[in-house]
Design a protein with these regions (language model features):
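Short acidic, glycine-rich surface-loop motifs adjacent to enzyme active sites
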Residues: 104, 225-247
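Structural motif
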Residues: 64, 100, 190-192, 235-237, ...
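Active-site glycine-centered loops adjacent to acidic/histidine catalytic or metal-binding residues
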Residues: 70, 105-106, 148-149, 241, ...
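Short N-terminal helix/helix-N-cap motif within the alpha/beta-hydrolase-1
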Residues: 73-76, 112-113, 155, 247
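Extended active-site neighborhood of metal-dependent phosphoesterases/phosphodiesterases
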Residues: 28-56, 113-230, 253-269, 275-322
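Active-site micro-motifs of SAM-dependent methyltransferase domains
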Residues: 73, 109, 151-152, 244, ...
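Post-signal peptide N-terminal segment of secreted/secretory-pathway proteins
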Residues: 104, 110-113
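Acidic, histidine-bearing metal-coordination/catalytic regions of metal-dependent phosphoesterases
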Residues: 1-100, 133-142, 327-542
């Protein structure tokens, strides 16, 4: 009786204390200097106002780019990844002609031959380097790559012999970690800020699933954002391998990196990879963060051969995720998809006063048909304004209330067709993102893991302790002929489960090790191993 009461109390104490410590650490972990700089960024941002541009049939004020993520070039798996990456760099980049290509991490696989361990293979990095060199893609566009957790496996320190990203990537030779790239097109400045949240040093698999920004790296990112403002940037995209929910940021408090990104009004979106759409369970892993920017996780190239086309059109950001070799590629930029409206940064008034529906169309063959239809209206032919821009006049005043549907049909000279449907609104009607997508992207991963662990611990141990206490009371009351009785199994719908739990709770040789093991998991190291290569010391990992 005494043991079970103590054990039960200890379980409750550990769970409550761990939650308290986690939240307390977030509250007291706010660096005052960082906080002051972010407050200054907000004040400065309130004085900046974008010029309101009219959405007509002009090809100006338009820029588009591509994103590819989680390539996982491997010595042991799926040899088609490399030749299809060659095809992407040759054919897709040539057809779409993006201003920028973002390669957001996990460029190589870095696994051992048994797929259990991790190792940086120089051959995988050579293949990546040779693809970019042989396809001449670096002379066609700006290629911005960043580390992923696989690119950082078994790396004892950055810029060492084991840090192959530095030697074989495009940006690794120029930038130690996070960096900024600004391009100018049509007189407008577009800035891309790369976030390197990889661990330093980089441990072996599987100990670097979550990224972290040190205080110095956070200061560096703020410096990049401030420099971007000084260069009078119009629109900014942040990108990295880890989603924001997977990045620890000591010094930024509970808001984390989202608090940093959201302080800059010119930031429209954060683009990432890493989660692989949870194995296809969340194929549309998108959300609008409370801080006022879109967060968009991209499905992987590794298995699904996905890439993203993003565009800024007259101050409005749109995107579409595409399967490799899926042609034609169609992206409607006006009216914008209602789900991805960014309040405070994109103007419904601009769409309301626009004169044309606008869409980008790309295909290896000549486009022979491009038509649009609004709601139950008739199909209307689009006019080609430039190589990729198609427009058609419309009357937005007819659609100023509620949600409406836009249909697009495109046919090319080789007989390939694409039919898309999207909803739009001109009055601010909001659509809801998928619940799982919001859960994964808006909540801190470490807190989600802590919650799941705490719930599992309670579900696993509390019934055992309750039945143990109940059994002890029954036995003591039986000796005194008391009123505490055993459960009547016929009155319970889970009689078989109760019987098994009751018996288990009475066998000390089973009950005590189970409770002890579970309590150990809350405070003891889970493994003792070499977390870093060529290390002379063991590391305790929990």
């Amino acid at each position: 009786m005494r043991f079970t009461t103590v054990a039960f109390s200890l379980i409750v104490f550990i769970v409550i204390f761990s939650i308290f410590v986690a939240n307390l650490a977030s509250l007291i972990g706010i660096d005052k200097q960082l906080s002051n700089r972010l407050d200054a960024a907000v004040s400065d941002g309130q004085t900046r106002e974008h010029e309101r541009l009219r959405l007509d049939d002009s090809p100006n004020h338009l820029m588009w780019f591509l994103q590819i993520s989680d390539i996982h070039i491997s010595m042991y798996l799926d040899p088609a990844r490399v030749p299809q990456l060659v095809e992407f760099c040759n054919r897709t980049v040539d057809i779409i002609a993006p201003s920028v290509v973002l390669a957001s991490g996990d460029l190589t696989d870095a696994k051992t031959s048994n797929f259990l361990g991790s190792k940086q293979h120089e051959q995988e990095w050579r293949w990546y380097h040779e693809v970019l060199r042989d396809t001449n893609v670096l002379n066609k566009t700006v290629w911005l790559d960043i580390r992923g957790n696989h690119d950082n496996f078994n790396v004892p320190a950055l810029q060492t012999r084991q840090d192959l990203f530095t030697n074989f990537s495009v940006q690794g030779r120029r930038h130690t970690r996070s960096y900024m790239q600004q391009i100018v097109k049509g007189g407008e400045r577009y800035t891309f800020i790369a976030v390197d949240a990889s661990l330093d040093p980089g441990p072996k698999r599987p100990f670097n699933f979550v990224g972290m920004l040190s205080l110095n790296e956070t200061q560096h990112l703020i410096n990049l954002a401030e420099r971007s403002r000084q260069l009078d940037t119009n629109y900014t995209i942040w990108f990295g391998h880890y989603p924001t929910s997977c990045i620890l940021t000591p010094g930024l408090g509970t808001g984390g990196i989202r608090n940093l990104i959201g302080r800059y009004r010119e930031v429209y979106a954060y683009l990432s990879g890493h989660f692989h759409t949870l194995g296809g369970a969340v194929p549309r892993m998108y959300t609008l963060q409370d801080e006022g920017f879109l967060e968009l996780e991209l499905g992987d190239w590794m298995r699904h051969r996905r890439y993203r086309l993003g565009a800024f059109d007259h101050g409005h950001f749109s995107f579409v995720d595409v399967h490799h070799n899926q042609w034609p590629v169609v992206l409607v930029t006006n009216p914008k998809d209602a789900l991805f409206q960014i309040p405070g940064k994109e103007s419904f008034e601009a769409m309301m006063h626009s004169s044309h529906i606008r869409l980008l169309v790309f295909s290896p063959a000549k486009i022979t048909e491009c038509q649009v239809k609004l709601d139950a209206g008739s199909w209307r032919d689009c006019k080609r304004v430039s190589r990729e821009l198609f427009v058609v006049p419309w009357e937005p005043a007819q659609y100023k209330r509620g949600l409406h549907k836009l249909f697009v049909y495109v046919l090319d000279d080789d007989g390939r067709s694409r039919m898309i449907e999207q909803q739009f609104t001109l009055d601010g009607t909001r659509l809801r993102f998928d619940f799982l997508a919001k859960l994964v992207l808006m909540y801190d991963t470490n807190k989600v893991f802590q919650t799941f662990f705490s719930v599992a611990l309670i579900v696993y141990l509390v019934p055992l302790c309750v039945f143990r206490i109940w059994h002890t009371l029954v036995r003591s009351e039986y000796d005194r002929r008391g009123t505490v009785v055993k459960p009547r199994l016929r009155t319970f719908c889970c009689g078989s489960w109760i019987r098994k739990m009751w018996i288990l709770s009475t066998v000390d040789r089973l009950m005590l090790p189970i409770v002890g093991y579970c309590l150990y998991l809350t405070c003891g190291p889970w493994s003792i191993a070499y977390a870093l290569p060529a290390s002379s010391n063991y590391h305790l990992c929990q």
